[in-house]
């Protein structure tokens, strides 16, 4: 799959990335080669391959879930720019 320069600019815009005109060609080649590789992987027949949850089939010993740090929520929220009902308020970044 070959991406055009306009495709790269659109992807960069959607991802909120600044891409210079000098870099568009290199990004188009790199992204196109990645998409070509994905197409090759999709062509592989995996109908009879059992799905794996994890490549190593071993049991993990888990440690006890114990509090190891003091609760400093009030201290951290006192220095935060904006807090409401115990939650941190941040600027909207997604339109």
UniProtKB/Swiss-Prot annotation:
It comes from the Bacteria. SUPFAM superfamilies: Glu-tRNAGln amidotransferase C subunit (SSF141000). Disulfide bonds: none annotated. Keywords: ATP-binding, Ligase, Nucleotide-binding, Protein biosynthesis. Pfam families: GatC. Its EC number is 6.3.5.-. It is an enzyme of class 6 (ligase). It catalyses: L-glutamyl-tRNA(Gln) + L-glutamine + ATP + H2O = L-glutaminyl-tRNA(Gln) + L-glutamate + ADP + phosphate + H(+); L-aspartyl-tRNA(Asn) + L-glutamine + ATP + H2O = L-asparaginyl-tRNA(Asn) + L-glutamate + ADP + phosphate + 2 H(+). One of its GO terms (biological process) is glutaminyl-tRNAGln biosynthesis via transamidation. GO terms for molecular function: asparaginyl-tRNA synthase (glutamine-hydrolyzing) activity; ATP binding; glutaminyl-tRNA synthase (glutamine-hydrolyzing) activity. Belongs to the GatC family. HAMAP family: GatC. Heterotrimer of A, B and C subunits. Allows the formation of correctly charged Asn-tRNA(Asn) or Gln-tRNA(Gln) through the transamidation of misacylated Asp-tRNA(Asn) or Glu-tRNA(Gln) in organisms which lack either or both of asparaginyl-tRNA or glutaminyl-tRNA synthetases. The reaction takes place in the presence of glutamine and ATP through an activated phospho-Asp-tRNA(Asn) or phospho-Glu-tRNA(Gln). This is Aspartyl/glutamyl-tRNA(Asn/Gln) amidotransferase subunit C. It comes from Thioalkalivibrio sulfidiphilus (strain HL-EbGR7). The gene is gatC.
């Amino acid at each position: 799959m070959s991406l055009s320069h306009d495709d790269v600019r659109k992807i960069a815009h959607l991802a909120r990335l600044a891409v210079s005109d000098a870099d568009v060609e290199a990004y188009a080649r790199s992204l196109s080669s990645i998409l070509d590789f994905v197409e090759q992987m999709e062509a592989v027949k995996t109908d009879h391959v059992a799905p794996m949850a994890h490549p190593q089939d071993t049991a993990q010993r888990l440690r006890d879930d114990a509090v190891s740090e003091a609760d400093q929520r009030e201290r951290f929220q006192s220095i935060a720019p904006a807090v409401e009902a115990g939650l941190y308020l941040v600027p909207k970044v997604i339109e």
